[in-house]
């Protein structure tokens, strides 16, 4: 099965693009092997009377554009998306300065570095480092399978050639009812091995398939009499003599389609092809329009009309063939089925009206009281339409009682015999008298032949201007015709238990049959579901049966015109009424409680619009209703796939204890909205309303969300396209967030995306941060908060130094006055005056967000960071790795900073035993750390990236300084090859490492410590696993 790899939001075929815009193809992170399949258990739509059925480093405090200024696009200097490598360097520098115990006066601040990074991101793309992207790849589904298809329409060329050059289909028992079904083998064309075999096998095959062929012939005859007869509007005087011509054109179309299907161009060599009944209303529309334009010129009317018929057939064939060759078989399946059902009901309504016109011989059905009263008060007229109605009622009742495919042909054969028997035994009745009274079709001319209609093809009498005027009707006819193949073909395959078929191949076959039918002066045709099922179940399991049916049909066609003069009009009327009844039941009765109210109302509107006004108008109304329905339904799409604050949605950066504590406290000021589905004028309103409700910030109401960074993630947007209204909607969202002093961030967007270009064109990207993925956006937001905390800490240190100087001056003055003072600074250094320490930090604006940041920063500074600095000073003369080790283990071993001295000293003494086993390493940027699955290390400075390569995809995390990580695999155990861990330095780094040999030595020297290290590694990995799993679930 020909699968093709495609990149997300890449250019694809037309049918795939539509599949994406409707949501059929989903993201590969959800399901790479997803195949859209639609059930085919509902009945086919066809005649059914036979069976009754980012810029970098900028702090968020940026001067906003005034509301009076219109946003303008910046095509010369487009907004640059933040690069992941620059972002990781920023995080590394921030962590290095963050963990230092003091800030030197002349040292560059982290903000200077962030500005450098930002300026670097603004440079031209050629000077930037290549942005490392993770592009989702997914298999494009081989085929949407439309209704039930288990096989792809996008099969490869070799398979196509295999299907085109196959042998006789194999026979396989069906699952129900003992029926036999067809399963195509290697060759579908009928090719006898040799002439001798053909000659000897012909008699036996003829006898074997003759009953099935006779049944198929009866079906063709009934179809010819029911709607072949009314190809032309025979109730109009100018067309009244063209009933036999319509039948001949019907037979020609049937023979050509049967030859194409049985000749090996179709997967159903025993299927029955026949004229499309749905074309009749369109033909009548064209014929009547031409008659009105050429009143009084009968020959020119007929010639122009018949040319319109054959041109429409050729046009239909070309469209069928093009759809099949372009592999667009599934595209027609996107048309709403209830619209098609309404069109089918419209055909049924038309047939009921036509049945009344044919039986009563009225020129045109009128919607007036005199006309309706005449149908009941004129006894002759009443009898002519009531009798076929009664025949139809009797037949419907008989079919419900007897479930046999022969009921229909047997009923009408018996009716025909009974009619002539009654005429024979009643002396006052005669065929001639009945013909004059309108009960039997008039006698055809004695020299009338089946090919007489070819005499009507006179190019000199064609009014080509009128032909051009009928092109809209021809297009509507073609559009309506192509909707049946993707419905009837899967339905027939299901009935025959076929597992392998190709809708595109069937479209090509229909293209041949319709084009050649028009070329030979006939009308449209298609594969008839009901007749094909009856034909195959009667024993037609070989193309031979199809060719035998062709021969019998040719015989009847040659005799044709003579037979018509002996057929009672009531039988033809009954057939028309039956077909109209079946289609109306299928449209209006069978869909009750299956369609919702809006869909059912749509069906009713289409039915009566087609029946009362015009078929083309009905299709236009149906398409408009379908578009309106799609618009209404699209506005109801759930555009928010998920919403998370920063406490839940965290980046995969592994940060030290102090940074983690601070981010835990202010995480709710980061808010993520994951968008999904389509972005257009119908869905942007719901997004605006959601954000407006979300950003209702109040100084008094603590229940309102305190959001500083709003991230809109575009990962699950189904189509890389957005209209102007939606782009302007995001501009309104941006202006609204600016009034609330909230930074708008967009993630999962790339510079090559059309959405990026649309946003740039409307000026949305000014003062908006852009990131290629959600992880980078979260990392940037966390860095901004950590920078703000560092600034607060720097101010606290400056105030602390000022306090110490003031205390010295106060001490000198007090000494001269013999007074004693208690310095505040000593109290602070001992951490005994927490309240004063808190007062060292402040923010200029007292808002709920700033108050929260200040409160959390004060708590972290007093309770955690001061404690960490104290033990760093206490153990600075010991092993240089010890303070780093204790700082890294603090979040996993709280006893390291326990207030109980004995507990703290015992814990520190225990872990101090590990220091001799560490080795200090300096690694340049982009260096690999070899671990052999046994390692424990501390990050003193720098930044590392750990990449996990799994069968399901690749995931990475960043290790900042002040953290520890390890991996220990017991001897004899091995990790699966497909689960690979790669550790690489993102910046120049300094590590303290216990490698595999040192771990083995530790195990021999101090088993208890080795076990604790192993348990520590397990604890670290468990914590990191939960963090990574959480991010994976959030970003899905």
Swiss-Prot record:
Record-level GO BP terms: basic amino acid transmembrane import into vacuole
Cellular location(s): Vacuole membrane
Domain STAS: 660-781
This protein's GO CC annotations: fungal-type vacuole; fungal-type vacuole membrane; plasma membrane
Signal peptide extent: none
Description of the deletion phenotype: Decreases cellular arginine uptake. Sensitive to canavanine; the effect is suppressed by simultaneous knockout of YPQ2.
Transmembrane residue ranges: 214-234, 237-257, 270-290, 301-321, 339-359, 376-396, 406-426, 474-494, 516-536, 547-567, 569-589, 605-625, 665-685
Protein's name in the database: Vacuolar basic amino acid transporter VSB1
Gene this chain is encoded by: VSB1
């Amino acid at each position: 099965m020909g699968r093709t790899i495609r990149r997300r939001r890449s250019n694809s075929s037309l049918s795939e693009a539509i599949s994406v815009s409707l949501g059929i193809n989903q993201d590969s992170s959800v399901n790479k092997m997803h195949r859209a399949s639609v059930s085919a258990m509902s009945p086919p739509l066809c005649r059914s009377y036979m069976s009754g059925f980012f810029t970098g480093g900028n702090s968020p405090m940026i001067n906003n554009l005034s509301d009076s200024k219109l946003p303008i696009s910046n095509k010369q200097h487009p907004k640059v998306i933040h690069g992941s490598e620059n972002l990781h360097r920023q995080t590394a520098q921030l962590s290095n300065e963050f963990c230092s115990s003091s800030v030197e006066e002349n040292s560059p601040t982290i903000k200077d570095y962030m500005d450098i990074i930002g300026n670097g991101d603004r440079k031209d793309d050629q000077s930037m480092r290549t942005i490392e992207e993770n592009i989702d790849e997914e298999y494009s589904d081989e085929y949407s399978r439309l209704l039930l298809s288990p096989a792809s329409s996008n099969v490869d060329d070799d398979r196509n050639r295999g299907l085109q050059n196959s042998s006789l289909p194999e026979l396989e028992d069906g699952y129900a009812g003992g029926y036999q079904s067809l399963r195509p083998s290697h060759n579908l064309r009928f090719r006898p091995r040799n002439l001798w075999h053909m000659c000897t096998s012909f008699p036996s095959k003829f006898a074997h398939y003759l009953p099935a062929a006779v049944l198929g012939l009866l079906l063709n005859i009934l179809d010819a009499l029911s709607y072949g007869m009314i190809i032309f509007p025979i109730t109009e005087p100018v067309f009244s003599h063209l009933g036999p011509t319509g039948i001949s054109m019907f037979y020609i179309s049937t023979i050509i389609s049967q030859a194409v299907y049985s000749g090996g161009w179709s997967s159903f060599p025993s299927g029955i092809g026949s004229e499309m009944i749905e074309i009749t209303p369109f033909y009548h529309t064209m014929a009547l329009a031409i008659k009105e334009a050429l009143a009084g010129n009968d020959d020119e009317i007929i010639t122009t009309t018949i040319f319109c018929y054959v041109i429409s057939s050729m046009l239909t064939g070309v469209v069928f063939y093009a759809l099949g060759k372009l592999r667009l078989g599934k595209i027609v399946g996107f048309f709403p089925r209830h619209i098609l059902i309404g069109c089918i009901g419209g055909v049924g309504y038309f047939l009921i009206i036509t049945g009344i016109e044919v039986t009563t011989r009225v020129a045109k059905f009128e919607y007036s009281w005199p006309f309706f009263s005449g149908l009941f008060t004129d006894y002759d007229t009443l009898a002519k339409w009531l009798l076929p109605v009664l025949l139809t009622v009797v037949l419907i009742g008989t079919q419900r009682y007897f479930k046999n495919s022969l009921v229909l042909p047997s009923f009408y054969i018996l009716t025909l015999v009974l009619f002539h028997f009654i005429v024979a035994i009643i002396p006052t009745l005669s065929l001639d008298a009945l013909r004059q009274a309108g009960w039997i079709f008039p006698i055809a001319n004695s020299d009338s032949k089946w090919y007489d209609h070819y005499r009507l093809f006179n190019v000199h009498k064609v009014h080509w201007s009128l032909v051009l005027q009928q092109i809209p009707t021809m297009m509507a006819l073609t559009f309506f015709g192509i909707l049946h193949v993707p419905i009837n073909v899967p339905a027939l395959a299901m009935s025959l238990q076929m597992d392998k078929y190709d809708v595109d191949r069937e479209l090509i076959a229909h293209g041949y049959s319709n084009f050649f039918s028009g070329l030979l002066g006939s009308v449209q045709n298609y594969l008839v579901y009901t007749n094909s099922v009856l034909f195959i179940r009667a024993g037609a399991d070989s193309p031979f049966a199809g060719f035998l049916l062709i021969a019998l049909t040719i015989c009847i066609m040659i005799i044709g015109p003579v037979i018509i003069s002996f057929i009672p009009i009531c039988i033809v009327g009954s057939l028309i009424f039956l077909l109209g009844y079946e289609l109306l039941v299928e449209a209006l009765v069978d869909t009750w409680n299956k369609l919702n109210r809006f869909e059912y109302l749509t069906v009713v509107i289409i039915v009566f619009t087609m029946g009362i006004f015009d078929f083309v108008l009905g299709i236009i109304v149906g398409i408009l209703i379908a578009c309106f329905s799609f618009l209404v339904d699209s506005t109801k799409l759930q555009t928010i796939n998920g919403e998370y604050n920063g406490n839940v949605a965290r980046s995969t950066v592994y940060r030290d204890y102090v940074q983690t504590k601070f981010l835990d406290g202010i995480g709710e000021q980061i808010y993520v909205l994951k968008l999904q589905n389509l972005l257009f004028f119908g869905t942007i309103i719901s997004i605006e309303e959601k954000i407006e409700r979300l950003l209702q910030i109040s100084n008094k109401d603590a229940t309102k969300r305190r959001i500083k960074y709003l991230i809109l993630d575009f990962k699950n947007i189904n189509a890389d396209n957005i209209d102007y209204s939606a782009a302007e909607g995001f501009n309104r969202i941006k202006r609204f967030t600016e009034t609330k002093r909230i930074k708008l961030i967009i993630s999962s967007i790339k510079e090559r995306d059309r959405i990026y270009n649309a946003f740039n064109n409307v000026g949305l990207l000014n003062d908006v941060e852009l990131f290629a993925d959600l992880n980078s956006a979260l990392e940037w937001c966390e860095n901004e908060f950590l920078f703000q905390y560092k600034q607060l800490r720097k101010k606290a240190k400056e105030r602390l130094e000022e306090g110490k100087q003031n205390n010295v001056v106060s001490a000198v003055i007090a000494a001269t006055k013999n007074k004693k003072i208690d310095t505040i600074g000593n109290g602070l250094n001992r951490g005994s005056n927490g309240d004063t320490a808190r007062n060292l930090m402040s923010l200029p604006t007292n808002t709920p967000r700033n108050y929260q940041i200040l409160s959390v920063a004060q708590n972290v500074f007093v309770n955690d960071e001061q404690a960490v600095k104290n033990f760093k000073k206490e153990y600075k003369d010991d092993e240089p790795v010890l303070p780093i080790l204790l700082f890294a283990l603090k979040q996993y071993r709280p006893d390291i900073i326990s207030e109980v001295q004995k507990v703290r000293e015992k814990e520190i003494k225990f872990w101090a035993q590990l220091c001799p086993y560490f080795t200090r390493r300096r690694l340049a940027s982009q260096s690999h750390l070899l671990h052999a699955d046994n390692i424990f290390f501390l990050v003193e400075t720098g930044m590392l990236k750990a990449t996990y390569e799994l069968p399901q995809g690749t995931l990475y995390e960043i290790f900042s300084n002040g953290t520890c990580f390890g991996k220990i695999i017991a001897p004899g155990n091995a990790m699966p090859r497909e689960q690979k861990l790669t550790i690489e330095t993102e910046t120049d780094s300094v590590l303290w490492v216990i490698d595999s040999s040192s771990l083995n030595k530790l195990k021999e020297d101090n088993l208890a410590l080795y076990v604790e290290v192993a348990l520590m590694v397990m604890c670290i990995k468990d914590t990191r696993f939960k963090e990574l799993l959480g991010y994976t679930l959030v970003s899905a």
